[in-house]
């Protein structure tokens, strides 16, 4: 309980001065940017529109850095990536109606991947709200309804004095585990109206901790300590909570093999003797996981991709640690612990007993050898060569962002991320066009290291306009486009299912010439020269494009 004596209510001298002498000409938009600054934001993403101009005008009177993209969906992807790599809430400023709706696919990805995006959209003037049809430009009967199924929370403003508290509440919601996108909407007239309210100088929106119940972690520790064949599945929650070190400590304490989900890439060292890497779409890995007598799942809901397309059927006891309450036991019954991964792992480390199993590393080697033999039998040398070239060219600490393309599907299973929180993809919601705008968002967060984006030619066309953004802000992003003349993965799916593919072949531009028309240097490469060309592009300042004409294939599935 909070008591009066715990609070510091007296303003500082600077706060009093700012409150009593606010600058002239401030409006509701100023309250928005002042609140964001007070909460600690430094960078905002977005795209202006008529109803939102009050917010955008206020940006020039603030210290916020604005990164404007060419399409709202891409601005949302950029904010998503900024939130992933920094762990901070990423403000996304949008206009009403079409502008707001264009962001929905990006917000769905942010929700699926637990990325903290603070979307602030405008509305028609307050007089036009209420569900009727007044004929305002961009008008929707219920704009919020379009967002409620996607975001964590919706926050409505109708008066200027509500702006700071509404944004603070949204900020707290976005950053309370599980992280996720939130929606705030403010009418046009509220944003434009002059305000006599004092400058916003003191904001507090501390996210709430999701603490494990001790009786649950006590039982979990006992099960792990006495297990004969414990195994750990590490998901994206481990990465988001910065718990990779604690995960490794626990695995080594009980000699438990660890496999990372595609969202958990980098959570556990790839070459560690206990590392099963990320081969979740391989039946050898699935069989090994099913044989565990105690399976600890940390920060994963064991969804479609993490369960080898729902063919995974554990025979032992499942312990699931998950910050998203709706995911607890949603796919497999077991001991569900609603908690942040870092806090739960800390509790387990304090209570679990040491357990030694010299055979664990041997078992891991056997599984990986079986996986390797299966892949080697499929004549997929080109695909492995291309992926190895990307890994060789990319600095260990550089983030990479992967679109929904065949090379990304390979990377989910076979790419060594080397560091936590460096490999990201759109595998949460699975929409096209994520890679390049997301990489721009990560580069805006840290310009000191190069960022890699990987797309196919089909996905690249979703975000080609953002070459202008990359050039305008001189962001250090290298975009690798694998050009196979169509939607390659869908071509494979349809050919396997129906004998031939339909609607998958594409007439695409000359990506090298197109990039150069934006003032972005571009190179056409080959599998043999990819490593050298990609490393050279990553080493140069500013944006660049590398185009690889290649027809890649997927490894055979094991879930059919």
Model regions and ranges:
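N-terminal alpha/beta PP-like core and its mobile active-site loop of ThDP/TPP-dependent enzymes
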Residues: 2-353, 393-396, 476-479, 515
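Phosphate/pyrophosphate-binding active-site segments
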Residues: 2-23, 161, 314-404, 522-560
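Active-site diphosphate/adenylate-binding microenvironment
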Residues: 29-33, 37-39, 47-60, 365-448, ...
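Short acidic loop-to-helix transition motifs that present clustered carboxylates
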Residues: 52, 72-77, 407-409, 527-531
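Beta-strand->loop->alpha-helix junctions that form or flank phosphate-binding loops
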Residues: 69-70, 257-263, 405, 525-528, ...
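Thiamine diphosphate
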Residues: 128-138, 328-330, 336-338, 345-346, ...
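Generic enzyme active-site microenvironment
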Residues: 183, 320, 401, 454-455
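Hydrophobic "anchor" residues on beta-strands that sit immediately upstream
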Residues: 231, 399, 452-453
């Amino acid at each position: 309980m909070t008591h009066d004596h715990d609070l510091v209510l007296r303003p500082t001298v600077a706060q009093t001065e700012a409150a009593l002498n606010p600058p002239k000409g401030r409006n509701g938009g100023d309250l928005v940017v002042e609140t964001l600054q007070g909460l600690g934001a430094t960078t905002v993403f977005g795209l202006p529109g008529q109803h939102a101009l009050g917010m955008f005008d206020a940006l020039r009177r603030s210290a916020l850095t604005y990164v404007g993209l060419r399409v709202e969906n891409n601005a949302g992807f950029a904010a998503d990536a900024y939130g992933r790599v920094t762990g901070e809430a990423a403000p996304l400023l949008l206009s009403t109606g079409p502008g707001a709706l264009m962001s929905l696919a990006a917000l769905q990805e942010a929700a699926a991947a637990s990325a903290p995006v603070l979307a602030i959209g405008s509305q028609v003037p307050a007089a036009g709200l209420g569900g009727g049809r007044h004929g305002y430009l961009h008008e929707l009967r219920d704009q919020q309804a379009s967002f409620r199924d996607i975001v964590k929370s919706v926050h409505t403003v109708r008066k200027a004095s509500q702006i700071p508290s509404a944004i603070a509440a949204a900020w707290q919601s976005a950053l309370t585990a599980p992280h996720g996108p939130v929606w705030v909407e403010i009418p046009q007239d509220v944003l434009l109206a002059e305000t006599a309210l004092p400058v916003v100088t003191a904001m507090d929106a501390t996210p709430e901790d999701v603490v494990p119940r001790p009786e649950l972690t006590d039982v979990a520790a006992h099960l792990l300590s006495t297990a004969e064949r414990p195994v750990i599945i590490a998901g994206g929650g481990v990465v988001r909570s910065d718990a990779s070190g604690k995960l490794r400590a626990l695995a080594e304490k009980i000699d438990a093999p660890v496999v990372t989900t595609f969202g958990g890439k980098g959570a556990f060292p790839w070459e560690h003797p206990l590392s099963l890497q990320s081969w979740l779409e391989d039946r050898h890995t699935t069989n090994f996981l099913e044989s565990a007598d105690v399976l600890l799942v940390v920060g994963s809901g064991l969804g479609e991709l993490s369960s080898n397309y729902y063919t995974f059927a554990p025979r032992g006891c499942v312990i699931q640690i998950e910050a998203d309450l709706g995911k607890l036991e949603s796919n497999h019954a077991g001991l569900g612990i609603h908690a942040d991964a870092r806090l739960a792992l800390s509790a387990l480390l304090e209570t679990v007993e040491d357990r030694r199993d010299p055979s664990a590393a041997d078992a891991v080697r056997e599984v990986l050898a079986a996986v390797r033999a299966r892949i080697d039998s499929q004549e997929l040398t080109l695909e492995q060569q291309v992926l190895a070239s990307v890994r060789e060219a990319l600095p260990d600490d550089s983030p990479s962002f992967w679109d929904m393309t065949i090379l990304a599907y390979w990377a989910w299973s076979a790419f060594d991320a080397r560091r936590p929180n460096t490999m990201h993809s759109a595998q949460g919601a699975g929409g096209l066009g994520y890679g390049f705008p997301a990489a721009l968002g990560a580069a805006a967060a840290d310009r000191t290291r190069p960022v890699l984006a990987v797309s196919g030619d089909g996905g690249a066309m979703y975000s080609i306009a953002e070459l202008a953004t990359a050039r305008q802000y001189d962001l250090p992003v290298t975009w690798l486009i694998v050009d196979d003349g169509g939607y390659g993965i869908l071509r494979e799916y349809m050919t396997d299912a129906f004998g031939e593919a339909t609607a998958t072949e594409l007439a695409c531009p000359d990506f090298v010439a197109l990039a150069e028309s934006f003032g972005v240097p571009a190179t056409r490469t080959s599998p043999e020269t990819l490593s050298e060309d990609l490393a050279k592009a990553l080493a140069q300042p500013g944006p660049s494009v590398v185009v690889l004409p290649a027809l890649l294939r997927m490894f055979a599935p094991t879930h059919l």
